[in-house]
Amino acid sequence: MELKVFKDTIAAYGGRWETRLELPVETEILIPDYLPAVFKIVKCLMEPVVLQNRVSGGRWHTEGYLRCTVYYQSDEPGCRLYRTEQKFAFEKSVELPAGSYAEGPAQVWGEPEYCNCRAVSEHRIDLRGAYILCGAVLATKECELLTSLADCGIEQRTRELTGLQRVAAEEKTLTAETTLPLPEAAESVLDINGNFVLGAVSLQTGQASVQGTLQVQVCCQPADTEELLVRQREVSVQQTVELPGAAEDDMAVAWGEVMACTLTAAEGTGEADLNITWKLHLEVWHTAARTVVADAYSTVCQTQAVQTACKLLNKTADLTGRVSVVLEDDLPDPDVAVKGCFVTLGSAIPQTREEKDTEEEIRLCGKGTAHVFCADARGELTCYDKNFLWQPEGIWPGTKADACTCLGASMARITSSKTGAKLRVELEIETTGILLQATAHEALCEVELGEEYAEGSDGPALYLYYARDGERVFDIAKRYHARAKDLVTANHMETDGKAPQDLTTETACLLIPAAL
């Protein structure tokens, strides 16, 4: 008689492949003649704008530009601040190590490595620096597992494996438009940024519908004041995205980011047209369940079983909410006045929590920098940088290698002030997404039968076994090559609708009928 073996292949979690790419910058920024000449450079910022981000055919391809923004002062009296920027294009293609990877966008984040900026003339700025762009690609592993066995006196214990598989992922660049009151003639627009607040996301077969709000903040300096003011405008957006492979009962994760904004005067209306370019991130996860063989033996033959570990992702936490950060520090000069603050925000990534005498735990941690603009009595502006860490609430058991985040974060509120010589910055960070963690499950991938057991007519027909509380009936029967159902019947055990292989015992003396 031949053993019948049934197998199935499961797409399991294979880890995250990460890399760091250096984006060098060496350029000159020319100040247009219609802008005042450079007297002092106050701050230079570098920020990546990713236009293409795709994993396909064993390669990760990304392209976009670094937005290099320079804030400077002219030699005119007062705390007037001016802004100029230049885009520095980049394109990178990285060959992934041998393996299987999820198609679609990679997770991208980064931070400036260094930035040196100086004025070489009144209308020319020399910029040299580098930005570290990080990418993480989701790897998959094909696990071939046994799903059922039959004949040859085989006894098997099955279990159900449940996990999430990413079936679709998309990044789509979109535009939205609104109007604002036209800035005054001498008013300087220093920055336009914003964030996306998710309202609702729903799935249909092959597509997703997303509703939300774009909150745009326009930072400007009016002609009659030296303070930096912020005007806000909200724009409701609704978008349908084609997602082949998505189904109604899948789980969708969506977040957005504002990439660029353009403010142009509308002729004859007294208003300005605000064009917003933003990116929508969408991921669809499908819950897959498989019944596999966790253990097996034969009552008539020697059995060699091979186990393997299969890692599956499951949702651990919902990360949607707001994170508050309060920064306090002594100002280098107690007499300066705080004029305003910009924030550079980094992504929150899994980090190992360093605590002694405890099991390994992780938390999410991101970096950021508050750029605080201060003015002295002469009207000269200086930027003080205050680095900070921000953390979504929660600590989870596990390892960094088994954690996977689908998370978007953006600034929702910035407030800066001083009391005496003490600086205070209050931040609110809007987060949307989930945390996934992989759990290893043991299952059989191969079973081989050996020689048949010797005839047991001369051996005992019945054994006594003193079972401990919580022992599995299947494991006891396996020790004696007996059938689990015979053991349950002989000891009049209550099954409560469970299969004999799944029952556990109390502390008792059990009768083990020989199966040979």
In which residue ranges do the predicted regions lie?
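Gram-positive cell-envelope targeting signals
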Residues: 1-3, 115, 310, 497-498, ...
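Membrane-lipid interaction segments
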Residues: 2-451, 456-459
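A structural signal for short secondary-structure junctions
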Residues: 421, 458, 468-469, 480
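Surface-exposed, interaction-prone regions with an acidic/low-complexity signature
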Residues: 444-466, 503-516
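Short alpha-helical segments in extracytoplasmic peptidoglycan/chitin-binding modules
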Residues: 467, 473-489
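Extracellular LysM carbohydrate-binding repeats and other cell-envelope/extracellular binding modules
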Residues: 483-516
